[in-house]
Amino acid sequence: MNACTHSCDPSPNMEEVWKRSLIRVTDEFTLPPVVLRVDDAIIGTLGNFSVSTGKAKAKKTFNVCALVAAALINGQVLEYRASFPETKRNILYFDTEQSPYHCQLVMQRILHLAGLPLDREPQHLHFSHLRAIAEPEIRRAIIRYAIYHTPDVGLVIIDGIRDLMHDINSSTE
């Protein structure tokens, strides 16, 4: 006897999605365009997610600044090298932890590393501070809106991603 009730039956749509999601050992795929490298190591391909983690005060923000600076000039900054297609040059940077003052310092550090002037808005960098917005749902909605309403986005940085949820240990979030 089957213990499943009506809720166990997959809908035809789910069945179709499930089948399309399967990967076979004989499938052939090509490497997505490599857009970020550290020396010769690939750290970012177009369309994929990467995470930078480390202990507090471990210079994560500085490394992200160098990476963003490389993406901003589509070239090399320190050991980071970026090569984004022209149709994916916009960078969205969201900070959930720092004040506008400190966010501006981060932006200035990025521009300095990129060799760009500090008296003009950078063409491809959109920097947003979200600390003043308390609700994680609203922060996520703003990020989602920016991603879907900014043309040619190639890189999204979220500094403080844990602030996009109420409880980092919650299995439902």
Indicate residue ranges for each PLM-predicted region.
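Long, basic/Gly/Ser/Thr-rich N-terminal segments
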Residues: 1-5
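The Walker A/P-loop phosphate-binding site
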Residues: 7-110, 117
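Conserved inter-motif catalytic segment of the P-loop NTP-binding fold
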Residues: 85-172
